[in-house]
Amino acid sequence: MPVSLTYLGIDPGLTATGWGVIGISGSRLTHIANGTITSNARLSLAERLVQIEAGLVQVIHEHAPDAAAVEQAFVARDASAALKLGQARAIALLVSARAGLAVAEYAPNHVKKSVVGAGHADKSQIRLMVEMLLPGAKAGSEHAADALALAICHAHSGSANERIAAALLRAGAGR
């Protein structure tokens, strides 16, 4: 019987952080849940980061993933926007690591190539392929679709030994 694992994909952003949880058993992928954590633009940066942190803690607590995949930052022309994205990414990395998850990072083009087959796929192509690979899945937002794509990419990238080791760790930890 194949080992079953759960992966969390996180598409970080200050305004909207997408998340998606998938299961993998052998080569079979299943959709578990997805959503978007939004922060209130009227709050201070620190308070908005706390909102993202609280949302991710809740997702991890509810779904108990075995590993997480976080999108790497792309180079933005707006330095201020790049810094804010970096801070949201730091929250995603910190929350995942603090929960004891193995955390992988993937460049956007790598995720697109892994899921769609083309490194420069657009958002509609990503959503379409995610919904094809995860029957019954309906991504609630572009951010959630991107997060599901990250989880799928991680499922495709992980070796069987990593999957087995993660499952054994999970079983030993009594999760």
Swiss-Prot record:
One of its GO terms (molecular function) is DNA binding. It holds the Pfam family RuvC. Its cofactor is Mg(2+). Mg(2+) 1 binds at D11, H143. Mg(2+) 2 binds at E71. InterPro entries: RNaseH-like_sf, RNaseH_sf, X-over_junc_endoDNase_RuvC. It comes from the Bacteria. One of its GO terms (cellular component) is cytoplasm. One of its GO terms (biological process) is DNA recombination. It is an enzyme of class 3 (hydrolase). It catalyses: Endonucleolytic cleavage at a junction such as a reciprocal single-stranded crossover between two homologous DNA duplexes (Holliday junction). Homodimer which binds Holliday junction (HJ) DNA. The HJ becomes 2-fold symmetrical on binding to RuvC with unstacked arms; it has a different conformation from HJ DNA in complex with RuvA. In the full resolvosome a probable DNA-RuvA(4)-RuvB(12)-RuvC(2) complex forms which resolves the HJ. The RuvA-RuvB-RuvC complex processes Holliday junction (HJ) DNA during genetic recombination and DNA repair. Endonuclease that resolves HJ intermediates. Cleaves cruciform DNA by making single-stranded nicks across the HJ at symmetrical positions within the homologous arms, yielding a 5'-phosphate and a 3'-hydroxyl group; requires a central core of homology in the junction. The consensus cleavage sequence is 5'-(A/T)TT(C/G)-3'. Cleavage occurs on the 3'-side of the TT dinucleotide at the point of strand exchange. Belongs to the RuvC family. This is Crossover junction endodeoxyribonuclease RuvC. It comes from Parvibaculum lavamentivorans (strain DS-1 / DSM 13023 / NCIMB 13966).
